[in-house]
UniProtKB/Swiss-Prot annotation:
One GO-annotated biological process of the protein: ribosomal small subunit assembly
Gene behind the chain: RPS28
Keyword Ribosomal protein listed: yes
Keywords noted in UniProt: Ribonucleoprotein, Ribosomal protein
Protein's name according to its UniProt entry: Small ribosomal subunit protein eS28
GO MF, one example: structural constituent of ribosome
Family, similarity comment: Belongs to the eukaryotic ribosomal protein eS28 family.
Organism: Kluyveromyces lactis (strain ATCC 8585 / CBS 2359 / DSM 70799 / NBRC 1267 / NRRL Y-1140 / WM37)
Length: 67
């Protein structure tokens, strides 16, 4: 990973559900470690559970909610 790329650390506070054509993506609500008042919904590929720390390359984009 390039050291010049700014990253944001976020903690998974709730697993919302599975999405994707085969369920290979998990929708989670994350809380930023620098600003704990800010939470967003993101899609995560691979295994994830509550309490995990994610490294977000881009922290402004939010996932659409599951139906």
């Amino acid at each position: 990973m390039d050291t010049k790329t700014p990253v944001t650390l976020a903690k998974v506070i709730k697993v919302l559900g599975r999405t994707g054509s085969r369920g290979g993506v998990t929708q989670v609500r994350v809380e930023f470690l620098e600003d704990t008042t800010r939470t967003i919904v993101r899609n995560v590929k691979g295994p994830v559970r509550e309490g995990d720390i994610l490294v977000l390359m881009e922290s402004e984009r939010e996932a659409r909610r599951l139906r």
